[in-house]
């Protein structure tokens, strides 16, 4: 018996990153982790910077970094719209670690005119990228 699937499209501001049938999608929603499977109730929600993990129709898993965005679930399709989407293999671990360090330093040395919100977003994105890299490393080590 074939696995139940749903059409998933992951789109960035620049291009379509993934389009295909999936058995499962997991993202970080505004209220925590969110799993979507075929037959999920319709939904429209914000997603936070983090990982999108998909299980494709053939059972293979793929991981992406999302900078945040919108998740729309319809009866026959799921759409993820994000400003930035990166395949896990394309993340520059050193650049993400440096961005994290810069944001932490800026927040620690903040003055009166410091844009805390922008630094917090940069920090959240860098930490999310590093989590995606760590997840991939753990999966490879298995």
Curated annotation (Swiss-Prot):
Its main location: membrane. Keywords: ATP synthesis, Cell inner membrane, Cell membrane, CF(1), Hydrogen ion transport, Ion transport, Membrane, Transport. Signal peptide: none annotated. It is found in: Cell inner membrane. CDD domains: F1-ATPase_delta. GO terms for cellular component: plasma membrane; proton-transporting ATP synthase complex. It comes from the Bacteria. Belongs to the ATPase epsilon chain family. F-type ATPases have 2 components, CF(1) - the catalytic core - and CF(0) - the membrane proton channel. CF(1) has five subunits: alpha(3), beta(3), gamma(1), delta(1), epsilon(1). CF(0) has three main subunits: a, b and c. Produces ATP from ADP in the presence of a proton gradient across the membrane. This is ATP synthase epsilon chain. The gene is atpC.
